Amino acid sequence: MREPEGGSAAPPVRYHVGDLAVARIAARRARTVPGVVTLRADLSQTLLGLAGTWLSPDPVPAELRAEGVAVAVRGDRADVRVTVVTELGHNCRDLAATVQHEVGAAVRETTGLDADVRVTIADIELP
């Protein structure tokens, strides 16, 4: 690493990534995993979403929605909970492992945070 002129090293970078930013990253990546039909919001997210539609005239684009993902950022770690719906024919354990891996990688790549990802399969759609 190159030192700046004058011989002193640059101070360490301090930053904070918000819960919503991490949730959007996680939701976007989870939706791309084969076998994930949709993300499912829990009751608290549903109620917040209803309140948000009354307060905000501009809807959030689908690719930026974070329903189905709950995040708590603490220091250099993010606790991420993802709730998905799959379709019949996908192995739930394999799907959960893939979502966990993909979401964790996306959060690390984008934010630099280590992520503890928990996946819940809320429903299986039948043909």
Where are these regions (language model features)?
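Contiguous, often N-terminal, cationic amphipathic patches that form binding interfaces
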Residues: 1-92, 98, 109, 113-127
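A short beta-strand micro-motif common to beta-rich folds, especially ectodomain repeats
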Residues: 99-103
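Short amphipathic alpha-helical signal-transduction/dimerization elements
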Residues: 104-108
